C-alpha cells in the first residue's frame, strides 16, 4: 500500500503512508461510485483522468502506469459509447468501484517529477476534481439536512445542473 508516490508525500512514516494510501483508494472508489449518477458521468470522468495520467506517465517514462492508464481510458471511452444518454447499458456499483480502484492506484503510482514532492499531490486531485467535488457537495448537503451521507439523493452537482437547465 505505502509504496506509491502519493503516499510517499506523507513523510517517512510507513504507517502514515499506509493510512494515506487506504484513505485515497477508498475515497476515490466512493467518489467514482457516487459520480455514477447520470449517463456517462463516471465513465467520462475516469476516461479524462486516465488520459491525463497517461500523458504524464508516458512523458516520465513510466511504462506500466502509462499502459494501465491508456487501457483504462480506452475501455471507458468504449463503454461511454453505450452509456451516453440515453444509456443502453449501465456500469453499476461493480464497474464504478473497479474503475475507482484502477484510477486511484494509477494516480498513486504516478510520479510527475515535481519538486517539492508535496506539490505532486495536486495532480491527482486536479485530474479527479470533478468526482471529488461532486462527492463533497453531496455528502455535505446530506449531512446539513441530517441525512446519512450514504443515502441516495438528487443533491449531486449533475442533478443541480439538470434542474437549472444547464445540461
Predicted features by range, described:
Residues 1-136:
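"…together with the soluble PPM/PP2C metallo-phosphatase catalytic core" -> "…together
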Residues 36, 166-167:
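A helix-boundary/kink motif common to multi-pass secondary transporters
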Residues 137-166:
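Cytosolic, membrane-interface loops and tails of multi-pass inner-membrane proteins
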